[in-house]
Amino acid sequence: SAASDVYKRQNNYEALHPTGPKSNYAYHTEAMDRAMEGGIDDVGIGVLFGLNTYRYDFIGLLMHVEHLEAKFGVGPHTISVPRICSADDINAGDFPNSISDEIFSKIVAVIRIAVPYTGMIISTRESQESRKKVLELGISQISGGSRTSVGGYAETELPDHNSAQFDVSDTRTLDEVVNWLLELGYIPSFCTACYREGRTGDRFMSLVKSGQIANCCGPNALMTLKEYLEDYASEDTRQKGLELILKETDRIPNPKIREIAIRNLKAIAAGQRDFRF
């Protein structure tokens, strides 16, 4: 995936990237075209809101979506919606185009309506409260326990050696985030089945636009959640997750798929792994 920092070329992009490999606006903006022409059929796009007026970049983002669908028949698999946030030596208030929580929520909601098939990503730079709000509006992918500095996962980061790209507002562990999602009634999914089954590009688009992908997503979410609960979760998270799985399994509409999912969930409890539709 790749994000275009800003779609406005003159007096904006070129001012932010005057030199270096990223200074070529056309080459950077057309990265997705080159990727898809080279055989990569799933791409992700995004724009860093706050560097320019949000209306301009929002329209640029949707035009980018429209272009990819028109040219390749496949829109972006994911859309990221980062916004200017504070980091080392950076104050978000110094950017006159930084956006409020209300505008941010509106952007998320309209993208979800305009591009219903895409996965929408929000990072840990957003607070817990902000993440909760946009989950209700269309965000489908979030992270937990993230580090934003070079080598951040290798060792504990010292206070006087901070190289973070941005401050992490949501500092909860993965287990805490999963527990929170379960309390909110969501199904935390660790599924990567579409990639592993080759359901990418035009195959994915046909499935998702017809709604048939629902026959895979729900059961796969429950099975991958079950694996997480068995292998990594705290006891409290595990109990909440098992209750949700029991409830959601009964809601699988296709009887045959429900039967297979129940069988696979029992196999996971017995120690087997890696089931998928």
Give the label of every model feature segment.
Residues 2-7:
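Short, small-residue-biased leader/transition segments that mark boundaries at the very start
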Residues 9-12, 87, 108-112, 154-158, ...:
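A short alpha-helix capping/helix-coil boundary motif
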Residues 12-13, 54-56, 153-154, 200-201:
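Short Asp/Glu-rich motifs
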Residues 13-25, 92-100, 160-167:
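Glycine-rich tight-turn/loop motif centered on a GG-T
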Residues 25-27, 49, 58, 72, ...:
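Phenylalanine-focused residue identity feature
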Residues 26-90, 100-129, 136, 141, ...:
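Conserved C-terminal portion of the radical SAM core fold
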